[in-house]
Structures are given as C-alpha cells and as structure tokens.
Amino acid sequence: MILKHSEDVPAEPINKPGFSGMQARFLLTADDGCPRYALRLMEIVPGGYCSFHCHKEEHEMFFLEGEEVLKTDVSKETQIRAGDALLLQPCEFHQIRNTGKGMLKMICTVPLFVGKTGRETTPCE
C-alpha cells in the first residue's frame, strides 16, 4: 500500500508551450509502482489554462474546486464547476481554462502506456 497526502507531493509547474499558470502534483505514478493508471492533481490559477491539445490517453477528471470552461472544439465551450466528472476519449481535443476568481483544482487520471510514467502523455498523430 502507498498512502500520500497531496500537500506532501511537490507542485511542479507545467512549462510546456500553450500552458499558463498551471501546475501538477503527480500523486501516484509508475514511479510509485502503479501498474495501470496515474493519479494527478492539477491546479490552475485564475486566468490560467492548458493548451488546446489531444493525446492518445483517455482522461478521467473530477473537479474539486473552481469555475472553468472546457473547450472541446474550435467553437464549442462548456461551463464546468466543482463536483463535475468528465471523461475525454483518446485523441479528443480539449482545453481547460480557469475562468473563476479562485484556484481551480481537479483530479486527473491517465492510463499508463508501456514505457510511460503518468507524468506525460502521448501525442495523437
């Protein structure tokens, strides 16, 4: 068994192109011995966002705090709020933006592909 408290896991800024004001706490990954899924806590400051992107891994997300907009198409945006659960299919484009006044916090899981740790995703071709 592995037990961690989220505050004991360092927040790591995501400095990839198209990301702003976002950090991740990699709670449980392949580095911890997870065989199939990684569990991550994503935090986005007010006005922050991730890029409009897709990857081969599915995403299961649960929104803990904040008000945000999910963009899944060039012209389609959906309001998301704390308590919402979301499934994004493999290679489904998406972007999360924090449109609220407080920190956005969401739990995000991704499957572990061979050779992956859960800290990164696999771009769609």
Q: Over which residues does each language-model region extend?
A:
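Conserved short histidine dyad/triad with adjacent acidic residue
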Residues: 40-55
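Short beta-strand His + acidic residue motifs that chelate non-heme Fe in jelly-roll/DSBH
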Residues: 50-52, 70-71, 88, 94-100
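A short hydrophobic beta-strand segment most commonly corresponding to one strand
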Residues: 41, 87, 102-117
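A short, N-terminal "cap"/entry segment at the start of jelly-roll beta-barrel domains
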Residues: 1-36, 121-125
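Short acidic-glycine-tyrosine-enriched beta hairpin
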Residues: 74-90
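Glycine- and acidic-residue-biased ligand/ion/polar-headgroup-sensing regions
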Residues: 57-68
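A generic "binding-loop/recognition-motif" signal
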Residues: 48, 56-57, 76, 92-93, ...
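Short, surface-exposed secondary-structure edge patches
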Residues: 41, 60, 76-78
